[in-house]
């Protein structure tokens, strides 16, 4: 799904909510991320979203959108995105928007606290540390939070 189609879907999904979206000039992206409760991190030219790591490092709640397969770091571990953000397949954005719109203040604060814990894993040094642990003990308890999975067949 193209980003322009995704924006149309976002606009339609927000109709019945108190949520709003803003597309800011690229020079002001950091300012807008800091002001936003939730930040969209659509997959990029590759399978994942570089913006996801940027949003986590800044300490805001990411909303990762994918088109065919969720390609997320640390999936299935205690530092999985589900503990501090949202994800959904493009085309089903309304479900994600409903989750965001109905989040309790307590759940939101818990997600922010989880972000503070996982932030280091989304920095360059944190990723290098995870790779080193995985190489030293790929199947053991000290192997870090990286997981291997088969690359999906769809080419991107």
Short names for language-model regions:
Residues 6, 54, 122, 150-153:
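Sequence-pattern detector for short linear motifs
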Residues 18-19, 70-71, 83-86, 140, ...:
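Low-complexity, compositionally biased segments
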Residues 124-156:
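C-terminal alpha-helical cap of glycosyltransferases
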Residues 28-122, 136-138:
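Catalytic binding pocket for nucleotide-activated donors in carbohydrate/polymer assembly enzymes
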Residues 1-25:
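Conserved catalytic-core segment of nucleotide-activated headgroup transferases in glycan assembly
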